[in-house]
Amino acid sequence: MDKMKDLLEMMEASKDDLPEIYCDMDQVLCNFIGRAEEVIGMPFAKFGKDDRWIKIRDTKDFWANLDWMPGAKRLYSFIQKYDTHILSAYSDRDDNSRPGKKKWLKKNTNIKPRNINLVKRADKQKYATTDGKPNVLIDDYKKNIV
């Protein structure tokens, strides 16, 4: 029995040594582009930036009702065991972005509210370390990945 206790104590100690996991939402958990293309009626990149954001902003509950990305439920089922954090950029072009993303998370995940970080894209780098230890960021945007 002492060996089992030792093993469990070692597992707890190693849990404390794990990096924080930060997961993005758009194009990682949620299919932002797919829904945006439905709303604007054409490929996202081919529609003018201002015009596409007007359409997104004018779509009721756009953010709260995004579909899961293919494979994202499987990813989430794995990472949610590790007190995962959300690190997602909000849109300055749509005031509904932050509250809508929070609604999506509440409806689709069990992420603790204190672990939800909706920030400006440039601020994501501030989450690279915690107390000098490197963290893990799951993100689709290459500029956010080292």
What are the roles of these predicted feature ranges?
Residues K3-D61:
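Active-site neighborhood of HAD-like aspartate-dependent phosphohydrolases
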Residues D16-L18, K81-D83, P113, G132-P134:
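A general structural motif
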Residues D24, L87-A89, I138:
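Short hydrophobic segments within beta-strands
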Residues L29-I33, E38, T84, R93-S97, ...:
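Short catalytic/ligand-binding loop motif for oxyanion handling, primarily in non-cytosolic enzymes
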Residues F47-G48, R57-I86, D94-P99:
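Short, acidic loop-to-helix structural element flanking the phosphoryl-transfer center
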Residues L87-R98, K102, K106-Y127:
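A short, structured active-site edge motif that brings together acidic residues
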Residues I116-V146:
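Conserved Lys-Pro-Asp/Glu-containing loop-to-beta segment of HAD-superfamily phosphomonoesterases
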